[in-house]
């Protein structure tokens, strides 16, 4: 079995971390029980680019128990948990990932998991693997379909669909209600702040926090910052989301204005250069810059490095940049995902639903091989509901069901006032 990780001797510690995650992922464990009995993925080759965390390990083990052969690479150069990677190798998973990869190593690892076995299913977090297969792989692969975990990745895949270049059907796992309403909002909302606190150990209360973007990630971060005592400003380009932020009680203004008053900045736009050098030059001395979007393009790190007259590392994941005007700004985790680079990512309880969706999406693609068009599909609602039902059951919560009379009422149109 091929693999490339940092240190196989870390496996015993990684196993304990995975056990801890699995204990808090009852939805995925329920699906694992069925997969173990039915083997719906028997003989299927899966190549996956995902954050190599203890929660991802629980998913990958579930796929293997379901009969799949899995090769895994990390979806961010700084997010891999090396002990977890080692534990997965001991479980028979081909892992090509370690914390601190450079760009060449990152893409080499993606190449390796395609070459190690020609995938039937492609799983991705950010669409780098999908893009690699479409741009770099000339051989004809027998790919049944793929999945995508993130908003950023779905945007890329939708662009590929629009250009007519998709080679296989995709399921946008990110678009499942049981994913984005919980993972994006509660997961990132908590874990991004966890990353900021681990990196800086600052007090949130009393600070002015600027959140760029008010999608599900942005609103989760904004609400949790407010809950910890920050005064929160939201910046947006979408008038509807900006209006939502106002109605939710946040101040809304352009980033050019917010940059003058903010103490902490968090980007969550899914777009490039939400914070540019022109904004950094306006910031207070000591402003903190962080990113909660998938790629390290939301803060103009390249421009910052070119502009700064002095750079020094202050703490792990904290770099101080002195600007030409003498002010200093502090960039966390080199502008990469602060929740995964400086902390451990989302809590297991929320990844339970996200990865339950991933497992069911893979099964769906295998069952529907050859029946789907080469386009991006939303997660089938019946699977979304299945995840919600299992999760509620695991929490000891019961809900009502529609009576026959209520079902009939909803299906007719003649009854009115």
Curated annotation (Swiss-Prot):
<keyword id="KW-0554">One-carbon metabolism</keyword>
<protein>
    <recommendedName>
        <fullName>Adenosylhomocysteinase</fullName>
        <ecNumber>3.13.2.1</ecNumber>
    </recommendedName>
</protein>
<feature type="binding site">
    <location>
        <position position="236"/>
    </location>
    <ligand>
        <name>NAD(+)</name>
    </ligand>
</feature>
<comment type="similarity">
    <text>Belongs to the adenosylhomocysteinase family.</text>
</comment>
<feature type="binding site">
    <location>
        <position position="53"/>
    </location>
    <ligand>
        <name>substrate</name>
    </ligand>
</feature>
<dbReference type="Pfam" id="PF00670">
    <property type="entry name" value="AdoHcyase_NAD"/>
</dbReference>
<feature type="binding site">
    <location>
        <position position="271"/>
    </location>
    <ligand>
        <name>NAD(+)</name>
    </ligand>
</feature>
<comment type="pathway">
    <text>Amino-acid biosynthesis; L-homocysteine biosynthesis; L-homocysteine from S-adenosyl-L-homocysteine: step 1/1.</text>
</comment>
<dbReference type="InterPro" id="IPR036291">
    <property type="entry name" value="NAD(P)-bd_dom_sf"/>
</dbReference>
<dbReference type="InterPro" id="IPR015878">
    <property type="entry name" value="Ado_hCys_hydrolase_NAD-bd"/>
</dbReference>
<feature type="binding site">
    <location>
        <position position="125"/>
    </location>
    <ligand>
        <name>substrate</name>
    </ligand>
</feature>
<feature type="binding site">
    <location>
        <position position="179"/>
    </location>
    <ligand>
        <name>substrate</name>
    </ligand>
</feature>
<dbReference type="InterPro" id="IPR000043">
    <property type="entry name" value="Adenosylhomocysteinase-like"/>
</dbReference>
<dbReference type="Pfam" id="PF05221">
    <property type="entry name" value="AdoHcyase"/>
</dbReference>
<feature type="binding site">
    <location>
        <begin position="292"/>
        <end position="294"/>
    </location>
    <ligand>
        <name>NAD(+)</name>
    </ligand>
</feature>
<comment type="function">
    <text>May play a key role in the regulation of the intracellular concentration of adenosylhomocysteine.</text>
</comment>
<dbReference type="GO" id="GO:0004013">
    <property type="term" value="F:adenosylhomocysteinase activity"/>
</dbReference>
<keyword id="KW-0378">Hydrolase</keyword>
<dbReference type="GO" id="GO:0033353">
    <property type="term" value="P:S-adenosylmethionine cycle"/>
</dbReference>
<feature type="binding site">
    <location>
        <position position="149"/>
    </location>
    <ligand>
        <name>substrate</name>
    </ligand>
</feature>
<feature type="binding site">
    <location>
        <position position="339"/>
    </location>
    <ligand>
        <name>NAD(+)</name>
    </ligand>
</feature>
<keyword id="KW-0963">Cytoplasm</keyword>
<feature type="binding site">
    <location>
        <begin position="150"/>
        <end position="152"/>
    </location>
    <ligand>
        <name>NAD(+)</name>
    </ligand>
</feature>
<dbReference type="GO" id="GO:0006730">
    <property type="term" value="P:one-carbon metabolic process"/>
</dbReference>
<feature type="binding site">
    <location>
        <position position="184"/>
    </location>
    <ligand>
        <name>NAD(+)</name>
    </ligand>
</feature>
<dbReference type="InterPro" id="IPR020082">
    <property type="entry name" value="S-Ado-L-homoCys_hydrolase_CS"/>
</dbReference>
<dbReference type="GO" id="GO:0071269">
    <property type="term" value="P:L-homocysteine biosynthetic process"/>
</dbReference>
<feature type="binding site">
    <location>
        <position position="183"/>
    </location>
    <ligand>
        <name>substrate</name>
    </ligand>
</feature>
<keyword id="KW-0520">NAD</keyword>
<feature type="binding site">
    <location>
        <begin position="213"/>
        <end position="218"/>
    </location>
    <ligand>
        <name>NAD(+)</name>
    </ligand>
</feature>
<dbReference type="GO" id="GO:0005829">
    <property type="term" value="C:cytosol"/>
</dbReference>
<dbReference type="InterPro" id="IPR042172">
    <property type="entry name" value="Adenosylhomocyst_ase-like_sf"/>
</dbReference>
């Amino acid at each position: 079995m091929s693999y490339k990780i940092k240190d196989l001797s870390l496996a015993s510690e990684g196993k304990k971390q995975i056990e801890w995650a699995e204990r808090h992922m009852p939805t995925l464990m329920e699906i694992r029980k069925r997969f173990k009995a039915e083997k719906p993925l028997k003989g299927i080759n899966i190549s996956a680019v995902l954050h190599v965390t203890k929660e991802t390990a629980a998913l990958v083990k579930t796929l293997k128990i379901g009969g799949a052969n899995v090769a895994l690479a990390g979806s961010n150069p700084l997010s891999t948990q090396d002990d977890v990677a080692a534990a997965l190798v001991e479980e028979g998973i081909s892992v090509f990932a370690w914390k601190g990869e450079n760009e060449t190593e990152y893409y080499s690892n993606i190449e390796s998991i395609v070459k190690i076995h020609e995938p039937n299913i492609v799983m991705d977090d950010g669409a780098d693997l999908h893009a690699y297969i479409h741009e770099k792989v000339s051989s004809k692969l027998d790919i049944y379909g793929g999945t995508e975990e993130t908003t950023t990745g779905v945007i890329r895949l939708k662009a590929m669909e629009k250009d007519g270049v998709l080679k296989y059907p995709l399921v946008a796992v990110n678009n499942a209600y049981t994913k984005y309403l919980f993972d994006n909002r509660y997961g990132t909302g908590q874990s991004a702040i966890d990353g900021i606190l681990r990196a800086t150990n600052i007090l949130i209360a009393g600070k002015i926090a600027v959140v760029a973007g008010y999608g599900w990630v942005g609103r989760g971060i904004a609400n949790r910052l407010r809950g910890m005592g920050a005064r929160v400003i939201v910046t947006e380009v979408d008038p509807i989301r900006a209006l939502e932020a106002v109605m939710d009680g946040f101040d809304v203004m352009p980033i050019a204005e917010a940059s003058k008053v903010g103490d902490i900045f968090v980007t969550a736009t899914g777009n490039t250069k939400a914070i540019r050098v022109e904004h950094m030059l306006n910031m207070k001395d000591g402003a903190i810059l962080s990113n909660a979007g998938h790629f390290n393009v939301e803060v103009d790190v390249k421009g910052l490095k070119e502009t700064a007259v002095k750079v020094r590392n202050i703490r792990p994941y904290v770099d101080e940049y002195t600007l030409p005007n003498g002010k200093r700004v502090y960039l966390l985790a080199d502008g990469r995902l602060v929740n995964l680079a400086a902390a451990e990512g989302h809590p297991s309880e929320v990844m339970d639903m996200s990865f339950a969706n991933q497992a069911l999406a893979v099964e769906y693609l295998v069952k529907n091989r050859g029946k789907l068009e080469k386009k991006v599909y939303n997660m089938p609602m019946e699977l979304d509901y299945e995840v919600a039902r299992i999760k509620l059951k695991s929490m000891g919560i019961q809900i009502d069901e529609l009576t026959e009379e209520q079902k009939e009422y909803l299906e007719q149109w003649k009854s009115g006032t």
